[in-house]
Amino acid sequence: MDEELKDYYVPQIFRKVFCEHSKEQPRERGRKDRMKKIGFDNDKYLKMQSEHIRERISKFDNKLYLEFGGKLFDDYHASRVLPGFEPDSKLRMLMQLSDQAEIVIVIGAPDIEKNKVRGDLGITYDEDVLRLMNEFTSRGLYVGSVCITRYSGQNSADAFKKRLEKLGIKVYVLYNIPGYPSNTSLIVSDEGYGKNDYIETTRPLVVITAPGPGSGKMATCLSQLYHEYKRGISAGYAKFETFPIWNIPLKHPVNLAYEAATADLNDVNMIDPFHLEAYGQTTVNYNRDVEIFPVVQAMFEKIMGECPYKSPTDMGVNMAGNCIVDDEVCQEASRQEIIRRYYKSMDALMSGTGTEEEVYKIELLLKQAHATLEDRKVVPAALEREKETGAPAAAMELEDGRIITGKTSDLLGASSALLLN
């Protein structure tokens, strides 16, 4: 729900601040609106992205396992930093491939065991599996099955499996493998991937998605490749993630905004050294993919005989960078997003759910993006109102660019006064 809030600012002694964007609402014709500046061609993206995935399918034995990272629904981060990107673009892109696509939803047994909750929705991962199934099927997408990963006899995972099976949903299990992911000799063997269930699929494109990170999407893809090759099918693997965008500069504000969004995960964008060595081209990836690539490469070699990819960048299919039509608009939108993330991290710190390290990291990203807090128009407006009244104040920027403020009084808090104004 926080993504639906208007842009507002509440300065206090600890600078406890919220800065959120609203969902765009229908606007009156002819209204002046700075948000109408478009930096991203969404129609071009839908066409180019779906074509590129089809092309990747054709390079293998008409069978591609696509690890789908990030949010499929309501990707407001992408829509904020790439003005013109629709929050449901990735879902719409998949719908263009609906006749070829089959979805497998992955969930980790340890996450079921500890009732892991999605921070943005406030529901447990197992409940989100059912929500995702409903969302996909209501849009005409085929969900073939659910896969429980890292299984080691958890009772809660057994109960969840039975619950799904009673609903008529196919459920497969991937077991916890000792030494994963480094012990490739064991992993790529009958005692490793060989012990896992083989997920029966019927379509050329198998989209592997999950309620959240760390669910085992890549492990599921590689386990399936092992089983497919055992059956004589030369299936392939690819990775779909919007950020970081591989073919724009490392320190481009769009990529810096991704680092700000993942400050709590300690993700760091970096030049892909494997791609640079193989092709002499500079591309951007993030640390976790770069660090795991030698292991993934070794697994591919054991499964296929050779690795089809020379770098983590090669594995990706993201076309977003090719659809930026106004770079300056995207840069400015991304600077605004980094400022928003800074105040969100400050709020998390004050409420005890964040860390100083997150705040420090985003402060550094602000400097790298050549942005200041005052670049967000509501900030100086609220600070000025606070200075005038000597009490916390709030400011909101309307869609037409006007700034509204609210002050603290005996009757109302600053936010309440702001909304009334």
List where the protein language model places each region:
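Flexible phosphate-sensing "switch/lid" loops adjacent to ATP/NTP-binding sites
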Residues: 30-209, 224-376, 381-383, 398-400
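Charged/polar low-complexity intrinsically disordered segments
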Residues: 3-6, 10-16, 23
